[in-house]
Amino acid sequence: MSDVLIRDIPDDVLASLDAIAARLGLSRTEYIRRRLAQDAQTARVTVTAADLRRLRGAVAGLGDPELMRQAWR
């Protein structure tokens, strides 16, 4: 596994990363490692027009109050 050194990260950015990592019970290193892995994976995912049409069909009823009432009974 390779190491990466990143210089000139603003203090407020590091503080934010540390706070997020702490909330998740992770070290800064582990949090950044996971985010980089997640970002690398997400970059390979492409969303097509067909994907968006399927999504539109799947969530079409969410704006229907009666359908939502029935779903929660």
Curated annotation (Swiss-Prot):
InterPro entries: Arc_rbn_hlx_hlx (IPR013321), CopG (IPR002145), Ribbon_hlx_hlx (IPR010985). Transmembrane segments: none annotated. GO terms for molecular function: toxin sequestering activity. SUPFAM superfamilies: Ribbon-helix-helix. It comes from the Bacteria. Keywords: Toxin-antitoxin system. GO terms for biological process: cellular detoxification; regulation of DNA-templated transcription. Forms a homodimer, which binds to a toxin homodimer, which then oligomerizes further to a hetero-octamer. When bound to toxin VapC2 the toxin activity is inhibited; 1 antitoxin may suffice to inhibit toxin. Antitoxin component of a type II toxin-antitoxin (TA) system. Upon expression in M.smegmatis neutralizes the effect of cognate toxin VapC2. The C-terminal helix of the antitoxin may obstruct the toxin's RNA-binding groove, blocking access to the active sites. Additionally, the C-terminal arginine of the antitoxin may remove Mg(2+) ions from the toxin active sites. This is Antitoxin VapB2.
